[in-house]
Amino acid sequence: MALSLFTVGQLIFLFWTMRITEASPDPAAKAAPAAAAAPAAAAPDTASDAAAAAALTAANAKAAAELTAANAAAAAAATARG
């Protein structure tokens, strides 16, 4: 019951905040369409950014796989010892 009341309180606060935001929009939000219309030359190189992100993701996945394998080996050794 307490969790439900807390959730209802959060929703009320969320909608209250949204109502205030809609009543007085952020000036930076008005400037966003102008920034989106910037020339393509000012845009970052998304291909190299994507390649860097893919390399980072692959490195993180490899590290996670190695850690998982090490943990599994340690758990198997501990189980074998009894």
Curated annotation (Swiss-Prot):
Q: Which residues form the propeptide?
A: 24-44
Q: In which tissues is it expressed?
A: Detected in liver and in blood serum (at protein level).
Q: Name one GO cellular component term.
A: extracellular space
- Superkingdom in the source lineage: Eukaryota
The UniProt keyword set, sorted, is:
Amidation, Antifreeze protein, Repeat, Secreted, Signal
The record's induction entry says: By winter conditions, at least in part by water temperatures of below 8 degrees Celsius.
In the record, Arginine amide modifications are located at 81
Q: Does the keyword Translocase apply?
A: no
Changing residue 73 to K: reported impact?
No significant effect on 3D structure
Q: What is the designated name of this protein?
A: Ice-structuring protein A
Q: Which organism is it from?
A: Pseudopleuronectes americanus (Winter flounder)
